[in-house]
From Swiss-Prot:
Lineage: Bacteria, Pseudomonadati, Pseudomonadota, Gammaproteobacteria, Enterobacterales
Top EC category: lyase
Catalytic activity, as annotated: O-phospho-L-homoserine + H2O = L-threonine + phosphate
Protein function: Catalyzes the gamma-elimination of phosphate from L-phosphohomoserine and the beta-addition of water to produce L-threonine.
Classification via InterPro entries: Ser/Thr_deHydtase_PyrdxlP-BS, Thr_synth_N, Thr_synth_N_sf, Thr_synthase-like, Threonine_Synthase, TrpB-like_PALP, TrpB-like_PALP_sf
Protein name: Threonine synthase
Organism: Serratia marcescens
Length: 429
C-alpha cells in the first residue's frame, strides 16, 4: 500500500511507515494512492460473510501484500472481538451501536486495530504514542495499548471538560499509560500534539507516533463497521440508505465515505455536528471560518478545526463527487435534550452524540428512504447528563462500575509546549 501526504504529494510512504509516522511533513495527513473498488457481485458476497472475514478482505484491498492475509485476519480477529449490532428505533430508522467494546465507544475498533498493526510492523523498536482526546479516543487507545511491549502511551485531555466516568476509564490504568490533564480546551491539546510532531529532535528521541483518527490504520478499521451495518439491513433498506454521522474530528465520516467509495450502497451521508459547526457553515457558505470552540453536552464533538476534513475534500476531488451532495446539520444543546427525550419515548435510551445524529437524520430523511445513525458511545458514559435530561437512573455497565472506584493517576500541565516537552523527555524508558 502506498500513501501520499496531502500537503506534499511527493512524499509517499508505505502502510507500515504511515502507521509508525502518523503524520507527514508539515503535519500533512496521509491518504491512499490507490482507492480500491469492489464489483457489485463482490459487495453482495462480502455482505454475506462474517464480520472478521469481511473486514480482513476490505482491509486487504487497501493494505495489499504488506501484511499477509493470514496475519491480517489474525490481527483483525484480535481487534474486533465484539459485535456492532443494528438496533431498530422506528420502522424507517435504526442505530448502528458501536459501543459494545471494552471501553464502550466506537473508538475501540480503530484503537485496537491500530495497536495490532503497530505490533505487526514495529517489531522490537520502542514507540511512544502521543495523542489528544476529547473523551473516547483516550479510553480506546489506553486499553488497546495497555501492557503492550515496547509501547509507551501519553494521552492529553482538556482538564474538567470530559465526563468523570470517561476520565476514570483511561486515567486509572498506570503502567505504560501516562495521562495528562491540560489546562485548556481540546483544540489546545491537539495544538500541543502537533507541536511535538514538528519537533524533529523530540520525534526522533521518542519515536513519536499519533493514535488519533489521523492515523491511517484507525481510519481503515472504521470502514469495516459500515459494511457490518449494511450486512444486517434488509435488501429494501440497502437501496435507499441514508447514514447520519455525529461528527467532531470527522474521522468517522471519512471512513463512511471510503466505504461508499469501495462500492458500499449508501445513497447519501449527513454530517451532524453540535454548536461547533465549522463544516456545516462551510458547506452552506463556501467559507472556512472556524470559531472558538464551544463547550457542549456532546463534548467528544467539541472541535472547531476538524483534523480529517482535508481527507474528505481529497476523496470528493478524487471521486469527482460534489461536496454539495453531503448533508449537514448543526444541533443545539436544547434540541439535543429534546431529541434524547423523544428517543426515550420511542423506547430507545441514547446520549447526546447519537441524539444529534438522529435529529439530523429525522429532519432530512425523505419518504421511501431508510435511515441509519451511529451510536458512538454507551449512554452510561454520560451518566450524569443523561440521567438529568431523562429523569431516570442508568445502570452502570460492569466495565465502568469497576473503573469508577479507582483513583486517578493523571498529571496536570498548563497548555505550554515547553512544559509538555520537559514531561515527555523525563518519562521512564
Amino acid at each position: 500500500m502506498k500513501l501520499y501526504n496531502l500537503k506534499d504529494h511527493n512524499e509517499q510512504v508505505s502502510f507500515a511507515q504511515a502507521i509508525k509516522q502518523g503524520l507527514g511533513k508539515q503535519q500533512g495527513l496521509f491518504f491512499p494512492l490507490d482507492l480500491p473498488e469492489f464489483e457489485l457481485t463482490e459487495i453482495d458476497h462480502l455482505l454475506e460473510q462474517d464480520f472478521v472475514t469481511r473486514s480482513s478482505r476490505i482491509l486487504s484491498a487497501f493494505i495489499g501484500e504488506e501484511v499477509p492475509e493470514t496475519a491480517l485476519k489474525k490481527r483483525v480477529q484480535a481487534a474486533f472481538e465484539f459485535p456492532a449490532p443494528v438496533a431498530k428505533v422506528t420502522d424507517d430508522v435504526s442505530c448502528l451501536e458501536l459501543f459494545h467494546g471494552p471501553t464502550l465507544a466506537f473508538k475501540d475498533f480503530g484503537g485496537r486495530f491500530m495497536a495490532q498493526m503497530l505490533a505487526e510492523v514495529a517489531g522490537e523498536q520502542p514507540v511512544t504514542i502521543l495523542t489528544a482526546t476529547s473523551g473516547d479516543t483516550g479510553a480506546a487507545v489506553a486499553h488497546a495499548f495497555y501492557g503492550l511491549k515496547n509501547v509507551r502511551v501519553v494521552i492529553l485531555y482538556p482538564q474538567g471538560k470530559i465526563s468523570p466516568l470517561q476520565e476514570k476509564l483511561f486515567c486509572t490504568l498506570g503502567g505504560n499509560i501516562h495521562t495528562v490533564a491540560i489546562d485548556g480546551d481540546f483544540d489546545a491539546c491537539q495544538a500541543l500534539v502537533k507541536q511535538a510532531f514538528d519537533d524533529q529532535e523530540l520525534k526522533d528521541a521518542l519515536h513519536l507516533n499519533s493514535a488519533n483518527s489521523i492515523n491511517i490504520s484507525r481510519l481503515l478499521a472504521q470502514i469495516c463497521y459500515y459494511f457490518e451495518a449494511v450486512a444486517q439491513l434488509p435488501q429494501e433498506a440497502r437501496n435507499q440508505l441514508v447514514i447520519s454521522v455525529p461528527s467532531g474530528n470527522f474521522g468517522d465520516l471519512t471512513a463512511g465515505l471510503l466505504a461508499k467509495s469501495l462500492g458500499l450502497p449508501v445513497k447519501r451521508f449527513i454530517a451532524a455536528t453540535n454548536a461547533n459547526d465549522t463544516v456545516p457553515r462551510f458547506l452552506t457558505s463556501g467559507q472556512w471560518q472556524p470559531h472558538a470552540t464551544v463547550a457542549t453536552l456532546s463534548n467528544a464533538m467539541d472541535v472547531s478545526q476538524p483534523n480529517n476534513w482535508p481527507r474528505v475534500e481529497e476523496l470528493f476531488r478524487r471521486k469527482v463527487w460534489q461536496l454539495k451532495e453531503l448533508g449537514h446539520a448543526a444541533v443545539s444543546d436544547e434540541t439535543t435534550k429534546d431529541t434524547m427525550r423523544e428517543l426515550a419515548e420511542l423506547g430507545y435510551i441514547s446520549e447526546p452524540h447519537a441524539a444529534i445524529a438522529y435529529r439530523a437524520l429525522r429532519d432530512q430523511l425523505q419518504e421511501g428512504e431508510f435511515g441509519l445513525f451511529l451510536g458512538t458511545a454507551h449512554p452510561a458514559k454520560f451518566k450524569e447528563s443523561v440521567e438529568a435530561i431523562l429523569g431516570q437512573e442508568l445502570p452502570l455497565p460492569k466495565a465502568l462500575a469497576l473503573r469508577a472506584e479507582l483513583p486517578l493517576l493523571s498529571h496536570t500541565l498548563p497548555a505550554s509546549f515547553g512544559e509538555l516537552r520537559k514531561f515527555l523527555m523525563g518519562l521512564p524508558a
